[in-house]
Amino acid sequence: MFACAKLARTPALIRAGSRVAYRPISASVLSRPETRTGEGSTVFNGAQNGVCQLIRREFQTSVISRDIDTAAKFIGAGAATVGVAGSGAGIGTVFGSLIIGYARNPSLKQQLFSYAILGFALSEAMGLFCLMVAFLILFAM
């Protein structure tokens, strides 16, 4: 956020020699001339508005900004993929409980098995949902 705007300048800004280019990018983007009142003449604000638009455009489409967006996509997709491991653990827990329940009371075999299938389906659905969100983050944004 405190990256100096002079590192991300266009050739037009270099020729203009504007003092705005030496301010931090956050200050250049957030201090819009149209939001300030009573500060200088309208001619100066109009000229500075053009320079601020150039800086804002360069700030929004810079290589660093795209790299940050790509890194955020990969981090988000990785975090969403962790849910698939939770699904595997849930399936293991469900069938482990089925075996323990069957060992304790073999007469409830059919009812325990139907509950185990229901638990398996819910765990698998959550895992697939997490995987779908990861793919959406990667390829739809």
UniProtKB/Swiss-Prot annotation:
Belongs to the ATPase C chain family. Residues 1-66 form a transit peptide. Pfam families: ATP-synt_C (PF00137). GO terms for biological process: proton motive force-driven ATP synthesis. SUPFAM superfamilies: F1F0 ATP synthase subunit C. Its main location: mitochondrion. The chain crosses the membrane at residues 82-102, 117-137. It comes from the Eukaryota. This is ATP synthase F(0) complex subunit C3, mitochondrial. Mitochondrial membrane ATP synthase (F(1)F(0) ATP synthase or Complex V) produces ATP from ADP in the presence of a proton gradient across the membrane which is generated by electron transport complexes of the respiratory chain. F-type ATPases consist of two structural domains, F(1) - containing the extramembraneous catalytic core and F(0) - containing the membrane proton channel, linked together by a central stalk and a peripheral stalk. During catalysis, ATP synthesis in the catalytic domain of F(1) is coupled via a rotary mechanism of the central stalk subunits to proton translocation. The keyword Transmembrane helix applies. It is linked to This protein is the major protein stored in the storage bodies of animals or humans affected with ceroid lipofuscinosis (Batten disease). InterPro entries: ATP_synth_F0_csu, ATP_synth_F0_csu_DDCD_BS, ATP_synth_F0_csu_sf, ATPase_proteolipid_c-like_dom, F/V-ATP_Csub_sf. Trimethylated by ATPSCKMT at Lys-109. Methylation is required for proper incorporation of the C subunit into the ATP synthase complex and mitochondrial respiration. The keyword Transmembrane applies. The modification N6,N6,N6-trimethyllysine is found at residue 109. It is a multi-pass membrane protein. The record marks 124 as: Reversibly protonated during proton transport. It comes from Mus musculus (Mouse).
